[in-house]
């Protein structure tokens, strides 16, 4: 995920190497020497960025990719959504950032995989600026199918050749076999 008002300042945020569901616990040296060095703290897995000056910032957010099954010919899960927007931010405003990470293999690595995490950029207590959904996990595939990628609407994709479940709607999770919404 990157934030920058052209061309003076550019901040690229990462998941800080975290693979845990709770997110990162510290910045470490991840941003040392970068434009946002010293402007970011972490609280409860959320990165808190203090805006350095008032201006228009271009924010690009990408959701985490899904994982793939052990026997999958393609070695990629569904792609996370990529969203870009311009926002007026105020000096010393706190922007809360959660960068989604890649999904994981399940306990039976041949048949289960996880979807990627969403990337969230919010101001104040929880006013969304950009939210980019993560891509779906893929069991066994021989070619890429767009139904496994994140959706840019408020309804998630069902997946490729999926009769067992459905995509989520309006922020609610999707259904699985025996647990279909509706």
Give names to the regions the model predicted.
Residues 77-181:
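Secretome/extracellular-domain signature
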């Amino acid at each position: 995920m990157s934030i920058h008002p052209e061309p003076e300042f550019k901040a690229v945020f990462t998941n800080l190497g975290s693979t845990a569901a709770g997110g990162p616990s510290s910045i470490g040296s991840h941003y040392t020497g970068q434009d946002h060095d010293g402007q970011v703290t972490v609280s409860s897995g959320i990165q808190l960025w203090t805006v350095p000056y008032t201006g228009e910032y271009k924010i690009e957010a990408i959701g985490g990719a899904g994982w793939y099954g052990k026997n999958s010919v393609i070695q990629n899960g569904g792609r996370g959504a990529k969203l870009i927007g311009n926002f007026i931010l105020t000096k010393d405003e706190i922007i809360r950032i959660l960068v989604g990470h890649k999904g994981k293999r399940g306990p039976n690595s041949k048949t289960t995989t996880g979807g990627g995490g969403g990337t969230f950029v919010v101001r104040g207590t929880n006013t969304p600026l950009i939210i980019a959904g993560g891509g779906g996990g893929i069991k066994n595939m021989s070619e890429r199918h767009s139904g496994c990628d994140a959706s840019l609407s408020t309804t998630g994709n069902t997946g490729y050749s999926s009769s067992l479940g459905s995509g989520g709607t309006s922020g609610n999770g999707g259904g699985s076999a025996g647990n279909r919404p509706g």
